[in-house]
């Protein structure tokens, strides 16, 4: 009798323990906020890949998944459509969506870099050699506006450029076929183009960095942020920790990015070394002037016909200020 009672007690205790574990897991799951982050399929979003893979987002209460797009602004369109919670793009595509009525906010700048490069035939030795040449880039992307600024900086009239709209994944192929003389994009397409062209192409110097520096803005739906203010702060805390991880664990970061992008780990490590990405999370009011310049260019080129979006309303510094006021400059 005693033996049977003990068995029953053991089984009951085991069952109770199992239920307790399930309840604990359920409680954890219920406290997590689902966040679908988007990223351009390139090495520049490595901090997000780290947050997903190393459990940093989950640590801060975020049930995160990073969705890859060919280019960052497609992620912004997904946010506008309610198919994602975050995106990261530069000024031009963001301004275009704002002008069309997208109600987006920017809690932080999350990537700063000199990552855009001009891959050109070796016969193009200096900026002015681009006049009359066929140059590929993604219309409406960061490369579009950055290359325009580059031409302006180096005295090349825009109507002298034969612009060709080519998706990132096809740029190397169209150059190899001889359909274009140069293209403007970032890694890993820069190195891939150099490898395929086998000495017939180079990275043009001076480069885009003489005219434009990439700032990638964390973009979110205003409605979502206002309904999930604690989660917004938690997401920013997680991104700050992602930056710290990248700085402390460069090799592990390369391995994670390589797996996400389906490239060799050594290639990812090399790209991270050669491209000066800064994943520090901050918000600088200087960005408002950049947006103002973009708006002028858009209007002059027929890309902005209505009222200029109110950029002051777009920036929401209060969430980052809760974490670290020193990261918020000029607001």
Stretches with model-predicted labels:
Residues 226-305:
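Secondary-structure end/capping motifs
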Residues 65, 73, 271-276, 285, ...:
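Short linear loop/turn motifs
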Residues 298-331:
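Conserved C-terminal helix/tail region of periplasmic/extracytoplasmic solute-binding proteins
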Residues 29-167, 172-174, 181-187, 202-206, ...:
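Short, glycine-/small- and polar/acidic-enriched structural segments
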Residues 1-17:
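N-terminal secretory signal peptides and thylakoid transit peptides that target proteins
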Residues 84-88, 176-181, 274-290, 321-328:
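Short amphipathic alpha-helical segments at helix boundaries and their inter-helical linkers
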Residues 92-93, 164, 169-260:
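Pocket-lining segment of extracytoplasmic ligand-binding domains
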């Amino acid at each position: 009798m005693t033996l049977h009672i003990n068995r029953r007690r053991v089984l009951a205790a085991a069952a109770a323990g199992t239920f307790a574990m399930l309840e604990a897991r359920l409680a954890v799951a219920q406290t997590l906020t689902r966040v679908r982050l988007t990223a351009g399929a390139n090495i520049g979003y490595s901090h997000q890949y780290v947050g997903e893979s190393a459990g940093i987002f989950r640590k801060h209460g975020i049930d995160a998944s990073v969705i890859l797009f060919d280019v960052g602004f497609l992620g912004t369109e997904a946010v506008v459509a309610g198919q994602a919670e975050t995106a990261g793009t530069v000024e031009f595509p963001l301004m275009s969506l704002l002008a069309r009525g997208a109600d987006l906010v920017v809690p932080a700048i999350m990537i700063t870099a000199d990552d855009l490069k001009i891959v050109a035939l070796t016969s193009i030795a200096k900026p002015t050699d681009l006049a009359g040449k066929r140059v590929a880039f993604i219309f409406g992307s960061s490369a579009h506006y950055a290359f325009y600024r580059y031409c302006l900086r180096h005295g090349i009239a825009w109507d002298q450029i034969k612009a060709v709209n080519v998706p990132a994944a096809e740029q190397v192929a169209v150059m190899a076929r001889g359909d274009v003389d140069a293209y403007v994009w970032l890694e890993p397409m820069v190195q891939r183009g150099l490898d395929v062209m086998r000495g017939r192409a180079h990275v043009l110097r001076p480069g885009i960095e003489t005219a434009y520096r990439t700032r990638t803005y964390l973009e979110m739906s205003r409605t979502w942020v206002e309904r999930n203010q604690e989660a917004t702060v938690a997401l920013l805390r997680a991104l700050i920790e992602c930056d710290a991880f990248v700085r402390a664990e460069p090799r592990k970061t390369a391995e994670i990015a390589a797996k996400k992008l389906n490239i060799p780990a050594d290639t990812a490590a090399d790209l991270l070394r050669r491209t000066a990405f800064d994943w520090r999370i901050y918000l600088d009011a200087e960005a408002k002037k950049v947006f103002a310049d973009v708006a002028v260019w858009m209007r002059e080129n027929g890309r902005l016909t209505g009222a200029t979006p109110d950029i002051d309303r777009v920036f929401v510094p209060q969430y980052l200020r809760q974490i670290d006021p020193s990261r918020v400059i000029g607001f």
